[in-house]
C-alpha cells in the first residue's frame, strides 16, 4: 500500500480489462484497446501466487 492518499489514488484509481488486461482510466465505461465492457478496479492487495 502507498504511504499517502495522493500516491494511492494515482496507483489504484484505474480499471483493468478482464479480457485483454489493458489499463484504462477511472472514468472508462469500456476498454480502450478491445472495447470490452467488463472492467474491474485495479487490485489493492496481491492475489495468491508463488508463496501460497
Curated annotation (Swiss-Prot):
Keyword terms, alphabetized: Ribonucleoprotein, Ribosomal protein
InterPro entries per UniProt: Ribosomal_eL40_arc, Ribosomal_eL40_dom, Ribosomal_eL40_sf, Ribosomal_zn-bd
GO MF annotation, one: structural constituent of ribosome
Keyword set includes Ribosomal protein: yes
Cysteine-cysteine disulfides: none
One cellular component (GO) term of this entry: ribosome
Signal peptide residue numbers: none
Domain of life: Archaea
Gene Ontology biological-process annotations: translation
UniProt similarity note: Belongs to the eukaryotic ribosomal protein eL40 family.
Protein's UniProt name: Large ribosomal subunit protein eL40
Lineage: Archaea, Methanobacteriati, Methanobacteriota, Thermococci, Thermococcales
Gene name linked to the record: rpl40e
